[in-house]
């Protein structure tokens, strides 16, 4: 997900999306560990998306938005 799209979301929406992405990352890691994941780069994409969301949450909470 692009940062521009994430910036338009509220703090509550970002928190919900963060929970969803963390669950997705867990599932991807388990699939990779069991050898069922065909596209191993999806784990990296999920990790970077989580980092983007956390960064935006910190920015928004720091600015009081």
UniProtKB/Swiss-Prot annotation:
Per UniProt, the keywords (alphabetical) are: Ribonucleoprotein, Ribosomal protein
User: What protein family is recorded?
Assistant: Belongs to the universal ribosomal protein uL29 family.
Q: Which lineage?
A: Bacteria, Pseudomonadati, Pseudomonadota, Gammaproteobacteria, Moraxellales
A single Gene Ontology molecular function, please?
structural constituent of ribosome
Xref: Gene3D superfamilies:
1.10.287.310
User: Which PANTHER family does the record match to this protein?
Assistant: 60S RIBOSOMAL PROTEIN L35/50S RIBOSOMAL PROTEIN L29, LARGE RIBOSOMAL SUBUNIT PROTEIN UL29C
Q: What species does this protein belong to?
A: Acinetobacter baylyi (strain ATCC 33305 / BD413 / ADP1)
Alphabetically, which GO biological process terms does the record hold? Answer: translation
Kindly provide the name given to this protein in its UniProt entry.
Answer: Large ribosomal subunit protein uL29
Query: Sorted alphabetically, which InterPro entries does this protein's record hold?
Result: Ribosomal_protein_uL29, Ribosomal_uL29, Ribosomal_uL29_sf
- Entry's SUPFAM superfamilies? Ribosomal protein L29 (L29p) (SSF46561)
Cellular component GO terms held in the UniProt record: cytosolic large ribosomal subunit
């Amino acid at each position: 997900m692009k940062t521009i799209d994430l910036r338009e979301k509220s703090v509550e929406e970002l928190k919900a999306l963060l929970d969803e992405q963390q669950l997705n990352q867990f599932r991807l890691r388990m699939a990779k560990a069991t050898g069922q994941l065909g596209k191993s780069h999806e784990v990296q994409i999920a990790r970077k998306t989580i980092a983007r969301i956390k960064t935006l949450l910190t920015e928004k909470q720091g600015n009081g938005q």
